Amino acid sequence: MSRGLGDVYKRQPAFFAIVYVGVMLSYVYQTRMLDGGKFHVWLIFLCSWGCDTCAYCVGVLFGKHKMAPVLSPKKSVEGAVGGVVGAILLGIIYAAATKGGMVEYAIICGVGALISMVGDLAASAIKRNQGIKDYGKLIPGHGGILDRFDSVIFTAPIIYFLSVLLIH
């Protein structure tokens, strides 16, 4: 008995859940298990949430040019630049506070910020494709847990590999 494309489409959510959430988030744990991982693991959240917060603030104040009007109409180019610069500065401050390498942390946070924006836009594309605004309703005004962690999910593997390459 052959299986049609319908079977493939029925299995996509399970595959998505395993790879997108399970495998990629496992890099948070893997980063924590590196030498010095108790400091490096925070870079994941510093990059993604720091970039998001700085991008929002700069975008609200100075945003004029839409970055991805179809996927995420409120995001601006100015906000994106502010997010990356903000994440780099947060990385430098974190390096000073933890006696880490400033250049290494700045590079990690800059690249991590870019990837976190890609993750956020990818999540927006998935939601638009499925015709939904948020992944859930757990956090009023913010959607579900996955909405808060979409950029973290993309950032975690990159921070892990950059930590291995630049710090270890």
State where each predicted segment sits:
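Hydrophobic alpha-helical transmembrane segments
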Residues: 16-54, 59-65, 69, 77-168
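Single conserved hydrophobic/aromatic residue that forms the stacking wall/gate
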Residues: 1-9
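Interfacial transmembrane-helix boundary/kink motif in multi-pass membrane proteins
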Residues: 10-16
